[in-house]
C-alpha cells in the first residue's frame, strides 16, 4: 500500500473516493485586513472571497484519515522509527541471559540463587544485579527483502548484507559501542527460517480448504474472518498488511477468502515472546522485538490487537494491557539512519557472520537448531517471486503428491498478473494466480464480488455481466491467489532504499560505484525498473558466492537440501521438510502450553468508516490514539 499511493506511479495511483474528507480538514486562511474597518462581512461571504487552497493528499494524510485508517493508527506508525529503537536501547539495560555462563558457573549466580533462569522465589533475575525489571531482552528479526535492498546499495551479496546487519545490531563494533546503557540485541533472527513454517502451514490450509470433507463454518453471519473458520476458495494471501487493510475497510465480502495464517513477521514475534516469557518466567513486556521489513505497512500490522499476548498467553488477565508480539518495525532505510545516528559507518562493518562464541544460544535446544541452522537455505527460484513464494510452494507441494505433473505458467494482462496451473496430461489438478499492485487487486476483488440479488419477483440473480467475465476466466476457479500490494512484490516495498537515495547513501558511507553502477542524477521509469531488477538479483542471489558458504567457525553455511518438488523423502518440498516443521511447531506448542491454532493463526474483521458518523463516535475513535495497541 505504501509504495503505490503517490503521484510518481500513476499506473497504480488510487484517487480519493467520494468519502475522502481530507481536503476540507484545513483551517481557513487568515483574512486580509479590510480597508473599511466598519464594514460587516458574513462568514459565508468571507469564505467565498478567498480561493480555496489546492487539495494535496499524501500517504501520511491517508494513514491519519478517519475515513480509511483511524488517527490512532497514524500515531502508532509515527511511534515506530529508528528513534524509538535508540530511545529504548538508551533507556533499558540489556538483560543478561540467565542461561549464559557467569563467574565460572553455568546459568547459576551464587549470590542470588538463580538457576537455569529461575530464581528461588519464582522471579527471573539478570544474573548481574538482580534487578530484571530495569532491563529488557532485545531481539531483532530481519526480512530477506530488506537484506536485498542493503545488498544492492553496498554492492554486496544478500548474505553479506545480513552479516553486516547482524554486526550492527549485535556485534562488538555495533550499537553497543554507543548509548547510555551499552545495550544491543541478544539475537538477530532471519525471518526466512520462520517463513518455512508459514509455507508448510499455507499448503496444509489449502489442502484442508479444498478437502471434500471440510465443512466451512465461515458462511455463518458474523464469523467471516474468524480464527476458527476455514477460508473459502480461492484462498487469498494474508501476509501483506497493505492488502489486508484495504480488504477490511473497503471489501468485507473478501474476509471469508483470507488465509488465517500469520505472516512471518507476526509468527516470529509470537514465537519469541511466548517461548522466552514462559521459559524464563519474565513478562512479555520485558522482551523487546524489532522487525526490519521492506514495507511501512508492516508497522500497522504490528499494531493489530489480534497480534498481541492476549491471543496466546495462557490465563491472560483482561484487566492488563496486552503486549505486542512485535514492538517496533523499521525499514531498510531507517536501519541506515539507525547506524548513522550512532555514528557508525555501515559500509565498514564486517561482512562475516558473528562467530559461534559471540552468539548466545536460544534457551531451547530444538528451537535453537531451528532458528539458527548450520545450513542456510537460499530464497526460492525467480518463478516463485520475491514475496515469500507462498503460491509456488503450494504448487510444488501438490506436484510432489502427483508424480508426472508439471507446472504451467502464463502471464496475465501485465507482468504483475501471473496464472499457474498444475497439469498432468489433459487434467488440470489445481489452478492458482498472482496479483501484485492495487490496479490488479481492484480487478481481483471486483471479480470476487457477489452478484446482486434481483429486485424483481422471480428475477434471476446475476443476469448482468458477471464480474469474472474479464480475460483470465473466473477467479473463483483458483484454489489460491498470492496478493501483494506493491507492484513487483515485496522487494519493491515502500521502505526500501529508493533509487533517488542510493548515490547519497553511497557518498555518505564512502562506497564507490563499480562496474558502471553509477545512477543517473534524475532517474526515470527505466532507471527505476533497472534498480528494482538489481534488488531482485540480490534477493535471488542466495549462495552464489563461494566465500559465503563457510562461516568463521568453518561450518558449511549455504547449502540446499533439495531444489525440486521430488525427493527420496516424500514430505520434503524445495528443501523444506513438512515433518520437521510440524515437529518443531508441536514442540513449541508443548513448551508453551498454547494450542497451535493460537500460535499460527489469526483473525480479520470488517472495519467501519467513521465518515458521516456523529461527533461522539468520532471522538471515540480519536481517543484510540492514546491507547497502546489496536487493530486496523
Curated annotation (Swiss-Prot):
Residues 544-554 have a biased composition (Acidic residues). Keywords: 4Fe-4S, Iron, Iron-sulfur, Metal-binding. The gene is NAR1. GO terms for biological process: iron-sulfur cluster assembly. [4Fe-4S] cluster 2 binds at residues 240, 295, 486, 490. Residues 27-53, 99-119, 210-231, 542-573 are annotated as: Disordered. This is Cytosolic Fe-S cluster assembly factor NAR1. Component of the cytosolic Fe/S protein assembly machinery. Required for maturation of extramitochondrial Fe/S proteins. May play a role in the transfer of pre-assembled Fe/S clusters to target apoproteins. [4Fe-4S] cluster 1 binds at residues 20, 62, 65, 68. Residues 101-119 have a biased composition (Low complexity). One of its GO terms (cellular component) is cytosolic [4Fe-4S] assembly targeting complex. Pfam families: Fe_hyd_lg_C.
